[in-house]
């Protein structure tokens, strides 16, 4: 394989960046909802401007009220966010209310950055008038011309006069990014709400809605910002509970789902639940996908050819120490030609022919992969009356990533920045594999390695079933599978694709944040399909920033087409890395 350049910013990658950012935004609001912060600008408590639960569900996939201005407190964090509008959403809405005891004069201006693609956005209220003292929702029609596919920036400017004699005027700017498709005519019917589960969620009674109270200023210093996020994440995590069939909450739960019933407590004290499966997709992405290949598709002739090319003499391999041992599998540290440090995978003498064949087949999965983030096989030794050796390069004390994370002395020294760096390295490696039509099918920390410089590499899954037996389960079909890492379509129909790899990568990121805890530890493997269909997903780890959790949660969208590609994941991880290192 040749290295692939992933630095280009395609339109679909930008789609992902803004789409991922919207979920980062909403989840960070959920984490901060319990705090009554007053560090933002104020407008004398005369005004509310917010998105109602229906609008938030349509655009952001969460049942909540998101305030831009609440009782005069301006949420600059929300105002600075550009909300993407999917192609199937034909209008956007806002809700406002005057709290001054009288109508507040206003003026509205809506601007499209491309009149050819998105002409004349029309609002259903006057461009100038008075904000009523009762709650009112108004909307802006965003009907694309269908002449070409593009992303169009829509800027909504709202000017509110609080006190004309004192020249007290508030200016608010709301930004949207509308996705327009070719032949997407203005007459197309809207598909805003067509999911029964989404409909059920949107039509919750008011007592079951989450009200977000946020007044965070983006201009806060780095120390305050980091401390605030850490405090809020810890507080939210301590309150996170799982309600099963109306029973008592399980405080040790590692998963969560959307709460579709009114909570017993107020929204400020109840757990915040999330179902990524109902996130509306961005329909502007059209990345071509190659036909995937996997271990099962390797022909015997191809396997023989690869082994022939990689054959090394057994006498050149020296084993120095045993790193891992299973029922039949072994992993050693050693040297090749007395100069090159290597990892050696092999099997015991009592291993069956099938186990030997599986070692060779899975060991060849990443054959020829030339990428700094991939641990490709270096050589194979097969000699009569001996078990095979599969060699991998192992500079700088390379070891298994899951074992590294399970070692308390190592795991507690890993920072959030380093976790993001690891995830970014692996996303680039997987983007490289997918660009060559290779689907990994078993992405997890057990199938990665790490060196002393915390550089991580993706490896194949050979011997993993034997070395990490608790990570695999047999569901009555005589096949050990990584059930807790698998997407719903992989569980139900054994359908593996780039999208199922994306799902597993989300679980891998969760492992990185939890020191390789077992995902869905409380769930019986036979119940996983049921739990995923019901919307349950892994809960946010205690030490995981909201933005990072949003990236992993987006990988768990129910429909494969709604999950991000690894090029998109890399873009989002790079953006988050820039954010968290800006003040360091």
From Swiss-Prot:
PROSITE patterns given in the database record: PROTEIN_KINASE_DOM, PROTEIN_KINASE_TYR, WIF
Keywords annotated in UniProt: ATP-binding, Cell membrane, Developmental protein, Glycoprotein, Kinase, Membrane, Nucleotide-binding, Phosphoprotein, Receptor, Signal, Transferase, Transmembrane, Transmembrane helix, Tyrosine-protein kinase
Signal peptide: 1-40
Extracellular side: 41-208
Location within or outside the cell: Cell membrane
PANTHER family: TYROSINE-PROTEIN KINASE RECEPTOR, TYROSINE-PROTEIN KINASE RYK
Similarity section: Belongs to the protein kinase superfamily. Tyr protein kinase family.
Name of the molecule in the record: Tyrosine-protein kinase Dnt
The species this protein was found in: Drosophila melanogaster (Fruit fly)
Lineage of the species this protein comes from: Eukaryota, Metazoa, Ecdysozoa, Arthropoda, Hexapoda
